[in-house]
Structure formats: C-alpha cells, structure tokens
Amino acid sequence: MTKQIIVTDSTSDLSKEYLEANNIHVIPLSLTIEGASYVDQVDITSEEFINHIENDEDVKTSQPAIGEFISAYEELGKDGSEIISIHLSSGLSGTYNTAYQASQMVDANVTVIDSKSISFSLGYQIQHLVELVKEGVSTSEIVKKLNHLRENIKLFVVIGQLNQLIKGGRISKTKGLIGNLMKIKPIGTLDDGRLELVHNARTQNSSIQYLKKEIAEFIGDHEIKSIGVAHANVIEYVDKLKKVFNEAFHVNNYDINVTTPVISAHTGQGAIGLVVLKK
C-alpha cells in the first residue's frame, strides 16, 4: 500500500509534540514585526507574538513562498508516497492557493485540501486525518470524510482589540473608536471559510452567554466531543468559559492553547478562538 504523508501549516494550534509524534510536516507562515521577519513557531512563539501586539507594534502575517511547498513536495514524494496537504482557509490566507499551485508543478502525487478553517477547527481535521491514514483509508475517501467532519465543527472568534480590525480594514476608524469607547467585543464565525462578524457583546459575561446559546443551537440533540479554546493571553476568560460550558453541556474534553499569530494579528490581545466538535 502506498505510504501517505501529511503536510500542514503553522495555524492549527496543535502542540508541537503532537505534530512531531504523528510525523506531520509543517510549512510555517511568516511574520513581520516592525519590519523584522520571523518564521512562525520557529523564530517566535505565539506567546511572544502576543507581547508585540500588546505593545501596539506593527505586525503582519505572510503565507509561505511557493518554493517552500515545491521543495517539501519533491522531497516527501520522491519515494512515491502520496502527500495530503491540508491548510487554513483560502478565505483567510493565500496559503491553500499557493500550495495547490505548487502541487501542479511537481511530479509527486499531492492532494491539497482547503480546510475552510483555522485554529483547532483545522487541528481537529488534522487529528481525524491522522486516524484515517492509520486505518489505511484511501486519499479520495479521506477527502469525503473530512468534508463530512466539517459539518460537525463550528468556530467562533471573540475579538480582543478593535485596533487590529481597524488596521486590517474590517471596520472603519469611526466604528472602531465608538466600539472602543463602549468596550464592545465583536464576535465572528466562519462562513464558508471567511470571517463574518455576527454579534457585538458588551462584557465577557454577555459574550459567554451568547456563545452558550449559539453552541446549544449548533449541537441540537448531539453531544459535544471536544471544545478547543485558543486564547490571546486571557486564561481567566477561558476559565469562565469552561465553568459555564461544564454546567450547560457537561463537557469533559478541552484542548487549550495560545492562539496562532494569524488570528491574534487580526483580533488582538484578549481574543479567543472557540471551536466546538460535536459527536
């Protein structure tokens, strides 16, 4: 049977230990901070990146160069292995499109998947992908199963700082100023892989109650398998979430990590990404 190799980028919020233990090859994004370049999770950690945001420094994220994908695909596929390359949403970054272009330029057998997600929403797809590969499932069937899995995943983002949305052009300076004065915390979700702002909360507690309501509607009669929380230096907010969700949904399995710079660069210090995987 042909060997299958998994490739992804640095935005899944899965631990380095998990990625290494499962032989997942990571092609990282790049970060620019006040003009200086860094390789995500290599030259700088998520925690260190958030410190720069707290200091209101100019930060940007960049997709990997096409040459990095070409080199990786050629090396990994030279023995005839199949490569399954899964990446953050094409609605959030050009990474998927670059990976796909690279796959068309090499002799290796590469299948590129748009996860239409990020953070633990991408991470849960990778974890499922790992199990499917271990079971010997064909690549074409894996693509179908991941498409089905995405229907059972919901991602919410609670914005930490409106300044980052202003810099990114998602809201006007006037709306941002008013929002900051009123201490509004916008909440967004992914719609076909694109971030859409859907609600404005005034306090942490009101944001938690909104999330609880939306999660209950999403899961319906199903149980929750896992909740992933990626936060930008607000562990006390995470603790509040867990307390409310434990009472409401009897959740036993949480995955918690500091959020990927691709999210925190746009949502600011104090943000969280909340991912729900239902059974």
UniProtKB/Swiss-Prot annotation:
Domain DegV: 4-278
A Pfam family it matches: DegV
Residues holding hexadecanoate: T61, S93
GO molecular-function terms, A-Z: lipid binding
UniProt keyword terms in alphabetical order: Lipid-binding
Function field: May bind long-chain fatty acids, such as palmitate, and may play a role in lipid transport or fatty acid metabolism.
Entry-linked NCBIfam families: DegV (TIGR00762)
Protein name listed in UniProt: DegV domain-containing protein SAV1425
